[in-house]
Amino acid sequence: VRLLTTVTALRCYLQKVARENQDLINSQGLVFGDQTNWFKTAVGLVPTMGNLHPGHLSLIERARRENLTVIVSIFVNPLQFAPHEDYHRYPRTWEQDCQLCEQAGVDAIFAPTPEIMGVVNTSSETQMVQVTPPSAMISGLCGRSRPGHFQGVATIVTKLFNLVQPDRAYFGQKDGQQLAIIKRLVADLNMLVEVIACPIMRDASGLALSSRNQYLTVGEREQAVVLSQGLKQAETLFRAGGVRNSIELIASARQKISIVDDVFLEYIELVEPNTLIPLAKIQEEGMLAIAARLGSTRLIDNTILRDRQPIIAIDGPAGAGKSTVARQVAEQLGLVYLDTGSMYRAMTWLVLKADISIDDECAIAQLANESTIKLTHSLNRDHPVKVWINDYDVTQEIRSLEVTSKVSAISAQSAVRRALVIQQQNWGKHGGLVAEGRDIGTHVFPNAEIKIFLTASVGERARRRQQDFKKQGQPEVSLEQLERDIAERDWKDSHRQ
């Protein structure tokens, strides 16, 4: 793992990574037009304040799976600590952190000093440009007792995004208010980074993992478990009892927590997870959030309550049978079948119809963001979903050999995926659907109740694809050619950004 402590070193490292990526493209013998199919490799950033624990490692492990280059930042941010808070005693475990990063396969650690990050002293908020999130998002929950905290977080996260310029950044759901603010920051400032929310990690007792847990005595750790138990009791009332109003849910959690006298509740609130607006009743989803003090330690925790039918996400390589299985599961369970593969095929058809070159990423990005895809139920068992794009019925056209040969190149383009993911996630807000496609359970519906990864050998997938072509009356294609095409698509899919 490379240890970087200055901006100059970080930029030099990122330039080196970019050159190596270009060399890899060249070594594969790709011409310029093929680079659209391959795409530059992704950089994943995991921002931390050090003192790494299994919760951080879960973020790093996910970043490792989804990116070629993983950078972990370690910076104890003075701007997010008030004068009376624990900045100077916040645990710093540099050697241990480096060892854990090495074991987790991290490529580089960026560990700047406050001076390198422009923080000259703890009162420097008056001396440097700061990022201030919307007041409605920072005035409630933790912001009520920690004025200035989220301005400090937003300022340093913005600086990290500008310095590293990652494709993806990973944050834990435990800091639910921070997560919502960072998502809003990225959206409002048009940052080209995808914020990945990762589940809360807990120990065997249910206590949410936190660097501040080490402040707790053995007895206090046992008492602190009551926070997650209170959330669990409210969650049970929500799921089994059908309770949706905030008064009853909050009262349930409060009643459970009150059995431990030493736990001082700072707040229990029900808010909308993305806007942080207080909720009187859950319509779609709500975040039940808690902050409490136990001795001298401040702890936070939360749970997301979703009022929707389940989402089933089926992932896997091309030709593995995802569509067939998804259709059958949807039919058996009475759920909606969201055919994401057909959406990418429809976009590919539109690109070809518009006579746009597949390596003209800018034109394709504009087309994707101006297009609307609709999926409607069909009585045709071979094509139970009718596909419309910009009011054109393209159900049959998207199965042509020409579309099939180009769809991987189009779906590999990040702008296309972003545009279609927005449409897919809008359909998924109310749940009750079965969705299939690459990365469907990680990027599109990370909170799906059931996730399935379906695979098959290249030979079996080629055989199925040949049978599909015959049913559709398409020209005969040899198994050998189909196997080569599928192997090529697997490679492209595994090397896309």
Where in this protein do the model-derived segments appear?
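Conserved nucleotide-sensing/catalytic segment adjacent to the nucleotide-binding pocket
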Residues: I356-R381
